[in-house]
């Protein structure tokens, strides 16, 4: 067996050759920069903790005490032997490289990057969203409120739920609302609010609403609400998810008066939402699949911008795309047909390309069996 950088290699277990960088044990490491990596493997009995050195001087003493005498080679790993046995730290920088850690070595721990929320900007207008008139009416009411939050106060439209099939324009309408008002839009997926450890998610939610309040009037759009707000009958609620839900309920209830902040939640499955969350939304707006006239408008709009002419009847396309969302029509029919035409080096999109796209969509839409 060979021990190198606190790792034991057994030649009987592996035939791989490990390049061992020559090190000078007499050279003292002046600086070592570490990055928390985690355990060599994971199992359901343990979770990889988030490492933050609250007291950097104390961490340096802790690190030197256990790794004194170890080789500091860039790209290698040091394993904790005390508080978190076998937790790995990668040596990002060692100066000089291949030197020895001593009592005089300065050891720095890289901080974990924290989730930051950024304003989403777009040039989409409500006229770009075809159909969904009920949702547009609600958005115009929200616009009235955000133009003069002090006038509405307790009568403000604070929490609204958008629901409906994927690709029906929920996110697009939220973007158009913020764009037309020129107010900040914070667009996030609910799954990103679940932190690595208990406490992370709640902190992120409070920071999100604090930021939205500071930049009010503003809109918070939370997509995939069912990822955190799933009815308790359908899940065994984990601690990290539970604290996210509680933090979200606190903000939506207005305990912290977030005047000028509107929360729009979005889900494809409103019936799966827990009543505690669903009841906080004052109104639910359904986004419906486009009808014949709406599909015709979408098709004409999309075809007009395509790089190749389309030699196929729009009226026939309206019939063939029945039951499809706007996103399906654009991404899975027209785009697939266009790419097929380009692959065939055809000067235009023809019937055979449309038929190919529709066939491909049907194949991808078929339910897959558990066993092949």
From Swiss-Prot:
One of its GO terms (cellular component) is proteasome complex. Pfam families: AAA, AAA_lid_PRS2_C, PRS2_N. PROSITE patterns: AAA. It comes from the Archaea. Keywords: ATP-binding, Nucleotide-binding, Proteasome. GO terms for biological process: proteolysis. The keyword Nucleotide-binding applies. ATP binds at residues 164-171. GO terms for molecular function: ATP binding; ATP hydrolysis activity; ATP-dependent peptidase activity. The keyword Lyase does not apply. InterPro entries: AAA+_ATPase, ATPase_AAA_core, ATPase_AAA_CS, P-loop_NTPase. Belongs to the AAA ATPase family. The 26S proteasome is involved in the ATP-dependent degradation of ubiquitinated proteins. The regulatory (or ATPase) complex confers ATP dependency and substrate specificity to the 26S complex. This is Putative 26S proteasome regulatory subunit homolog MTBMA_c13930.
């Amino acid at each position: 067996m060979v021990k190198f950088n606190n790792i034991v290699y057994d030649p009987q277990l592996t035939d791989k050759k490990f390049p061992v960088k020559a090190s000078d044990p007499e050279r003292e490491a002046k600086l070592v920069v570490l990055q928390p990596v985690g355990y060599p493997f994971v199992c359901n009995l343990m979770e990889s903790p988030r490492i933050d050195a609250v007291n950097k001087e104390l961490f340096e003493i802790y690190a030197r005490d256990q790794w004194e005498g170890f080789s500091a080679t860039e790209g290698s790993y040091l394993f904790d032997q005390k508080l978190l046995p076998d937790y790995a730290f990668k040596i990002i920088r060692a100066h000089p490289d291949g030197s020895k850690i001593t009592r005089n070595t300065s050891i720095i721990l890289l901080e974990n990057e924290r989730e930051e929320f950024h304003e989403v900007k777009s040039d989409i207008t409500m006229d770009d969203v075809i159909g969904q008139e009920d949702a547009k009416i609600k958005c115009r009411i929200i616009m009235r409120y955000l133009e003069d939050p002090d006038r509405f106060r307790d009568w403000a439209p604070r929490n609204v739920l958008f629901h409906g099939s994927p690709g029906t324009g929920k996110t697009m309408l939220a973007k158009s609302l913020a764009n037309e008002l020129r107010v900040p839009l914070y667009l996030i997926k609910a799954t990103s609010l679940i932190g690595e450890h208990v406490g992370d998610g709640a902190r992120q939610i409070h920071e999100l609403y604090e930021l939205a309040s500071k930049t009010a009037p503003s809109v918070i759009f939370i997509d995939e609400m069912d990822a955190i707000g799933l009815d308790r009958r359908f899940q065994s609620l984990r601690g990290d998810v539970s604290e996210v839900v509680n933090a979200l309920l606190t903000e939506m209830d207005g305990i912290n008066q977030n005047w000028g902040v509107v929360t729009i939640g979005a889900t494809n499955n409103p019936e799966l939402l827990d009543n505690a969350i669903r009841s906080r939304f004052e109104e639910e707006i359904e986004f419906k699949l486009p009808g014949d006239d709406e599909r015709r408008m979408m098709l004409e709009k999309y075809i007009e911008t395509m790089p190749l002419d389309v030699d196929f009847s729009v009226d026939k396309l309206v019939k063939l795309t029945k039951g499809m969302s706007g996103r399906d029509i654009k991404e899975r029919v027209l785009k697939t047909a266009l790419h097929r035409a380009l692959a065939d080096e055809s000067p235009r999109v023809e019937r055979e390309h449309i038929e190919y796209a529709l066939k491909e969509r049907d194949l991808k839409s078929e339910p897959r069996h558990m066993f092949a």
